[in-house]
Amino acid sequence: MKIMEDQINPINIRKQKDLDDNLEEITSENSEIAPADIEKKMLENHAYPSPTQEDFQRAIYVKRDFYIHSIPERKVLNTYDEIKEFRDNKCAGNFKLTESQTLLSNFINPNTPYRGLLMFWGTGVGKSCGAIAIAEKFKHMVEKYGTKIHVLVPGPINKQNFLNEIIKCTGETYTKMFQDKTIVINEAEKNRIRKNALNVVNQYYRIMSYRSFYKKVLGEKIRDKVVTGNKVKLTSRKTETGEFERDISIDRIYSLDNTLLIVDEAHNITGNGEGDAVKKIIDVSKNLKVVFLSATPMKNLADSIVELINYLRPKNYQMERDKIFTSQRGSEMDFKPGGRDYLRKMVRGYVSYLRGADPLTFAERVDIGEIPPGLDFTKVTRCFMLPFQLGVYDNVIATQDDSLDRNSEAVANFVFPGLSKDRNSKNIEGYYGIKGMNEIRNQILNNSETLNRRIASTILSEYEIEDPSNLMYLTDNNSVISGNIFNEKYLKHFSIKFYSALQKINETVYGKRNSGLIFIYLNLVRVGISIFQEVLLMNGYLEYQENTNNYNLKRDTRCYFCDHKYGDHYNLPDDIPKHDFYPATFITVTGKSEEDIEQIPEEKHRILNNVFNNVNNREGKYLKIVIGSRVMNEGITLRNIKEIYILDVHFNLGKVDQAIGRGIRFCTHYGITNEKDPFPKVEVNKYVVSVKNGLSTEEQLYKKAESKYKLIKQVERILQEEAIDCPLNRNGNIFPEEMKRYANCGTKDNPCPAICGYMPCEFKCGDKLLNAKYYDPDRAVYKKITKSELDYSTYNNALASDEIDYSKAKIKEMYKLDFIYTLKDILRYVKKSYPVEKREMFDDFYVYQALNDLIPITGNDFNNFHDTIADKYNRPGYLIYINTYYIFQPFDENENIPMYYRRIFTPPTINKINVKDYIKNTPEYRQHKNLYQLDEEGPIDREYDFDSVQDYYDSRDEFDYVGIIDRESSKRKNGTNSSGDEFKIRRKRPKILSKKRETGIPSFLGAVCSTSKDKKYLASIMKKLNLDENKSDSRMDICDRIKNKLFDLEKYSTNNMTYLIIPSNHPHIPFPLNLKDRVQYIIDQIKRETRSSINPEIKTIKTTGEFNDIDYIYYELYYDSSMDKYQDILTLYGAKKINNDWIIIIK
């Protein structure tokens, strides 16, 4: 690859000799510098400003390093076409880092003196990408020192999310080396590219949960059980010196030298052991830089900001809480005199702020309701309780401490009617909370008839109920209280709040309030979410099922779109648009424990992303309602939300705002905006129970929360005003539409919006010198700076990389259109495409350097060449320079071919796509595939689900050897097993959980029988199973016989012992396999679906089978004619009507 010497562009010969040379010196190749200028440059201060400077913000503002990345001013857009174009660029354009994200990568990197930063950015504005932009600047540190960039996240789901963000936020950095743009890439190839990219990412990043980091730094405390009387207490073991004994991890982290530590949702590490671990590593590590991410840096109290900022400040110059806040705690806390000024001084240089929430890319939040007397800004829907609930409420003493009062909250949510504990009393008493629910369960089990009859004759006497037997009963193996008391007709007597919310939810249909997606948030699970789920089930809503055939549609099942139910949906009025019936469904999202962190189960996370957030589901066709707990506060995005319901009170309004932020995020409503509805709104409904005189406990709790929230917002305003990028990000924090709308907000008639913390949206930065010189009070913006005023003292080639990359991208754009350009052409195109407001700062050097990188000359250049260019035919190549022309050169052509052959290209068809991939992407293949892929079986390669059956098998004792039916590994598939199953086996596992973690304990799924066990081992199992050994049997034969015996033992045994484990979603073997358990399972399912408590008569019938030592039986279930009305449900379970009975045979 050699060309004539006189054809080589001089730019290519001139490589970068000194990265710290001034750009103006570099761009002028033959410039002469006078001795006086040399002396002046030698005396220049090439240092960054210190956070201790009072004019720190001004010094940052005028630096070329940062000013180039200021957010440009946006004018008011008046026409829909202008708004649509703006949104298309922001929401649907190709991904690129925002100016704010790039700015931070120039502020925190290995070459700047700044140690750490709190990224106080709003929800959904790109915190993760900002942190990743910083991290990418540390990759050469990873290569140099053999360390890794460490990222701490709350839990496993967040870990996967952050990995996804790395791939998204870095463009083609990790993927371009694995993809060939000249061929069709199918889904399998995309997955392969992604997998390879993640492998590269993992060479630079180490992502772990807070808890894992804590274990690797400090170690878990060793706890002992101490039994005193009937109580068991856990105590932490201590050494002789009084320190806690700890279980130290093998791969312990002692320090993180020469790298970067990122902590996502950093407010979670204050006041706990995880924070202690972070502090220890920061204190002992050398040259460690730290980035904290948080939309709500204060969890509950304003003074938690002190601990968070102190992680970033020098160890010997920490912020003191008592100089800022008064000694009171909770809602009584306030600023001390001089506290604000001291706080400003101590946070200066350590905070970046970006509000985001541009009204053109964020839906508008509309708070519904009224502000009760005594509250300042919280709008709520007040629900006045009826006599029964109010009587119980009056007997509950309101708590006065600063915590969530679970008793009063439980009463506010739901009061269950029950028999009096005084046997002589015939009154109905109210029960609430978990204890109350347990009491009601016992009463239903022991005295259901009396209880229901008494409820009908007292509380519900006005309804004249003829058959009260279904008012309350138990379902799901007697664990769930259900019944008609949850029906809308009676619900208001037991929960006025849930009744009011249900009425409004029912109206979210066409012709009333229009159909749309709903998010319901409750902090309490067992006395909140579980009860409201039952309310929905009893009022025509169904729990979401991935297989639509599993829905049990009844006459009163609600339609997702209109107000007509399933029974009369066939006869819709003409004024309702034609639509197919799909049931209105919901899904509950509560946490599962993962290293003491509440995490969303992966399966539900997938459903939220793929089903609920799908634009085709924008009206709730497939999934209408999400009910979530506090696990939904962070890391989840809900798209196209129409309404949000907050059904219980949290003592921390910041947490409530985080929950609301799940549905109001950057571009989440982009897919449903149109000219008729250009500005989508999200209604936020906060429900509280109320009393006629004074405030209820829920309203009082909101009042306390307001006091804390106001102080937190005052602290946040100080952080906003002192942020390093305050003047640079001003146009991303204050928007022209809001300036006009909320110009004089703060009165009762015109309150300031929640997005601005119920304070005026406009604010000035804290630097007085900056404001005096650059603030324009008439336009409420900071003035532009001319190029001559900019400080170039610390600007170098490394910081110019973003502009160079921009130039490369534009040059690559050009070669998609033509094959040959002059330098003049390229300079003109790149400059013209540069943003107008920054064009003055554009330097020709960026284009020179970009061209230099795109033209490999030496063999070493080719070996390290990554800036591949593609022409209009997607051929990969590079640039060559010949006689003042820059010419596209394909990799597979000689450099001396005439231009005619460069312009003419016949794409070869050989080996561009293999036959297998071609066939798999044809409609014929997909149609053929679907014929053999039943809907209820799901995707052919779907993994078996053992997680959901773990509790079932853990509750049973195990036989000495346990078999497992698992999906065959892809590495072992040979086409001989049509079912795709393989039989595994293992020894019995210990019953106690702690013993299961010891060395040598077999895994839950065991090992493949036919390949991992020798014949001697298998023979001992056969002996244990009373099977005769055949010497001619192969290992495969022996395994088949063992499997058959364990299969029948599992199926027919009645001793509650596990012999064979099967997944819940096996396409052919039902779960549970054990017939005795399956009988109870079917009975419970029928109870749940019919909402009845009727038990069938069960007959056990003996039969014969393969093994003489097994008692073979089957069961018959007999339901009488009272179940005729549930004919459709019974037939689904195989029931047949014989004489007057419905009979289900289970065998």
Curated annotation (Swiss-Prot):
Organism superkingdom: Viruses
EC number: 3.6.4.13
Pfam families registered for this protein in UniProt: Helicase_C, ResIII
GO molecular function, one term: ATP binding
CDD domains reported in the protein's UniProt record: SF2_C
InterPro entries in UniProt: Helicase/UvrB_N, Helicase_ATP-bd, Helicase_C-like, P-loop_NTPase
Chief location category: virion
Compartment(s): Virion
Binding-site residues for ATP, renumbered to this chain: 121-128
GO cellular component terms listed in the entry, alphabetical order: virion component
Span(s) of short sequence motif DEAH box: 264-267
Keywords: ATP-binding, Helicase, Hydrolase, Nucleotide-binding, Virion
Domain Helicase ATP-binding: 108-315
SUPFAM superfamilies found in the cross-reference section: P-loop containing nucleoside triphosphate hydrolases
Catalytic activity: ATP + H2O = ADP + phosphate + H(+)
Primary enzyme class: hydrolase
Coiled coil location: none
Stated family: Belongs to the DEAD box helicase family. DEAH subfamily.
Protein name in UniProt: Putative ATP-dependent RNA helicase L377
Organism: Acanthamoeba polyphaga mimivirus (APMV)
Lineage of origin: Viruses, Varidnaviria, Bamfordvirae, Nucleocytoviricota, Megaviricetes
